[in-house]
């Protein structure tokens, strides 16, 4: 599709769609709790719909109403053997976390996904789950999907140090540990998003978190809750970037989740000299209104323990860096290589095609700014964040057209992205 170019200013107010991570987990905990859970503000993107369908296939009654989703939870012991293989679509969150849920079920399940998901290694999850007593068969030594697994009602507890900083792997092991006989200890490499831990407490469970060490006992039961999902800061990041780099812009973003494990993007913007204000802060919901204005940005260095707190925002941060004065260095971000695409290479290729000066490295990028961007043809390769990054980059293009191939990938996390873009574009 041809993208909008040469924007003369952005203005307006947007309500950000529900947080994808919280939407996934609220469906899972609602299904595993006893009673009726209602979820308000859920994201109805393709990834979340994959999770919803998987739990329907596992015997959970889920009603999608206009204002909320209603889940008739069955508990861990109420899941049923599905009549067919579970289709995870493009969702790494779905296949990894549901692997943990299924670890304590004594039936055999096959899980598969699209071409992109079928290239993503699952061994980070399958290796510790096998240690707990789960039988899993995948393709190659990296356990690429499809996965066939048979859980065990006699799961062994585990003490496990995560080899990488990954909230998905951590969460999969937490779901398995909840079904094990005894106490499990999970030790993180770096602190990652803590939505799973928060939701355990919200649904009446318990765990102990001491720094990077998580202790969790098996045999817990959950009680149904009402869940209000805040807006996704990973989706808001694209509008934050647009407001910063398109001249004469001022945007207000409502109901943005500001969980402390997800706000690395705000710290980077501050370090680059960007103007973002927080207001209407709701500490209970961990949400706020963000107001962003056009700013003169400067290069910075991004690495270390902040990386897990902004891993999904690095593509749009790379675009910000192309419009900052000076050099930006991103490091310790090798996790980008095993996302929906190799995001280090694909981000560099896409923005360089538009005139940026980005050098990919083994664990990140070196970006020289400031550069003028021009028209080009860019392929998302099925990666939603590459698509949205390119659409924001196109707003700066004054010469040539920007054509985006496989733009439908954006529906994974933000089905209303282009209508929201239209709403804030002037001139």
UniProtKB/Swiss-Prot annotation:
Annotated Gene Ontology cellular component terms: cytoplasm
GO molecular function, one term: 3-phosphoshikimate 1-carboxyvinyltransferase activity
SUPFAM superfamilies referenced in this protein's UniProt entry, alphabetically: EPT/RTPC-like
Any matching Pfam family: EPSP_synthase
InterPro entries: Enolpyruvate_Tfrase_dom, Enolpyruvate_Tfrase_sf, EPSP_synthase, EPSP_synthase_CS, RNA3'P_cycl/enolpyr_Trfase_a/b
Entry-linked Gene3D superfamilies: Enolpyruvate transferase domain
Active-site residue numbers: 312
Function summary: Catalyzes the transfer of the enolpyruvyl moiety of phosphoenolpyruvate (PEP) to the 5-hydroxyl of shikimate-3-phosphate (S3P) to produce enolpyruvyl shikimate-3-phosphate and inorganic phosphate.
The family this protein is said to belong to: Belongs to the EPSP synthase family.
Subunit structure: Monomer.
Descriptive protein name: 3-phosphoshikimate 1-carboxyvinyltransferase
Organism annotation: Streptococcus mutans serotype c (strain ATCC 700610 / UA159)
Gene name as annotated: aroA
